[in-house]
């Protein structure tokens, strides 16, 4: 007879709480079959084995393999009644504890995964890496919780260095360290036991890669970053910072990680935190800043990394573009620190400008000197094509120009349009810089894409110049260096024509005395007056166009042709009349006694 689950009397007896071998023997004598199976495919002997009733097991199946702990201890005792009733889990625990592996696989099959998982919390097995490995290989449930509500992984993390082999066994079997506060359990235990080996740091990193929580603080309120600083684990600190932990999180004493790094004298941690955006101005519970902590312990070397007076830290992870930004402010110390933190000396900003270019353009000689000493490239151009040398020339920084030339800046580097720095200096009217560039072997005959030479650029400057001495010094410097005063640029313009305003719009303001002085200097070079631009404008046409009577007189005395006609068949006098310069037009006719210029103009107009 069987019940609804297919169990007969022998099977039910084996599953009962208290049953003696004599009862089982009596049932067998009554021909109750012992080898029938229930609805789950189990035999009576399997039920007895699961309950640890080894005397009944031997009675039901003498060939059933008994655990070594049972058979070895009672192998010489006759009869089956003396075999003890010991649950498989107990026998399994003892076998693992004493390293006796024979027969344990069969015992493991008699235990539920939850029961095997409970052994992972056993005081004698939890730290035994081999036992942990064996249990996991045979189906132990790694999510079973102990009396404190911890899974085996978290229980081991709380034990620190002594649990490392067992933790590694769990990780090898894919047990996840995920869950709030797992990492800080390990870090807190390491801090408590003063265990800060690199192997432990590597384990912490492996835990993070496998999903450990990098954010939750410890039970005492210490965040992972602060604990990592205490342990001096730089790689762990960097991992945490790069993955977004709070840089300003306070520990149980109200201190940030930067406070701790300063107080402990950990300069590498301090630099890392500064680079990752930690604030030197954060205040601890007692009101002190990291800078104050450094000064109070006499560590001025650390204080240097915390004192950003001119260029302030941006309260974020430092970027390469911060180097040019600091250079723009002229903060040499900030630039030095940024480079020492690993940022490239030739880092560029959004405009492609390097720190050297920004410092050169800003006139910060100290920053320029430091950058050059650190190996900055003096030729690195911005997106616009500007170089540090062109920036220094543009901003009239003579000393910086000299420093860049000494550092090897290419003096003939072409800017957009084929312009050289010598042309740029001439166009800006900088005789001192022009002289320095020529001394450094700048090519006075070089031309740009419009075939303009440096002397042409100086002439362009001269038309709107206000300083006669500067213009004359500029022209003297170029002419003494061998510049050709007769060279015709694109559009057939000579330096003389440009000096007279060939490229200027009519009505452009100019100082006639300054232009006259420049023309006199070119006339000293016996420049040709028989030149004209594409419009057919000669020197007198241009002087008339801009209303320059003194220049008209001087050009006429020098032999300029007053009857020369432009491309529209106009004489210089007609140009002056068209522009309304009556006094200028009068310069082209011989003076009549007693007749004013205006009267003569009105008479001739009839």
Language-model features and meaning:
Residues 17-19, 52, 99, 127, ...:
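Ankyrin-repeat intra-repeat helix-capping/turn positions
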Residues 50, 54-98, 103-106, 110-114, ...:
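Ankyrin-repeat-protein effector appendages
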Residues 122-126, 147-150, 154-158, 164-171, ...:
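Core solenoid repeat modules with strong leucine/isoleucine-rich periodicity
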Residues 25-33, 59-65, 105-112, 133-141, ...:
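Ankyrin repeat domain, specifically the short helix-to-loop turn at the C-terminus of the second helix
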Residues 6, 41, 75, 88, ...:
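Start-of-repeat signature of ankyrin repeats
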Residues 19, 23, 55-56, 103, ...:
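Conserved ankyrin/ankyrin-like repeat signature
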Residues 3, 38, 72, 146, ...:
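Ankyrin repeat boundary/linker residues
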